[in-house]
């Protein structure tokens, strides 16, 4: 009797896992350094101005992230304070100049993160972004829109004129969190990197809190 009641549950779980995997495949736009642009990106948006990459072990507690170019040169480095209530993160460029700072709001139900980019852009991101039924999220302070699969960080970033700024894709079936950032507007490079680093840290925090 017990096994009989468990079978429908197991079948439903399998269907859900397959469905999530299928959706991830649909949205995935990852390509490795040295490979050509994802064919869907190329058809929809053309050749990106440049591509950047991040990599981190899937279940690592290490928060530092290197952002590399097509030749595996480190162009940005993200470092976080391990013992900080606000999970303060600093992003620096290859010359060790600060390009952005990220800070988590204390006592927030929505895990709000404040991002300050050198040059004047300031905005916030929250875990509301990861609601499973939403495929679109607007960063009000910038007027930018993220559209896609946020749970796996496969999304397109548009500006307030609906022009593509960047396309972010995660590599599936990997022991590392690997992301590709195809940049179509290099003037917004630092802001895009800050968004991706913030979302990576938020996803890592969600995994650790649920484990």
Locate each region found by the language model:
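Short, strongly hydrophobic alpha-helical membrane anchors
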Residues: 1-5
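Low-complexity or membrane-interfacial segments used for flexible interactions
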Residues: 7-88, 94-97, 106, 110-112, ...
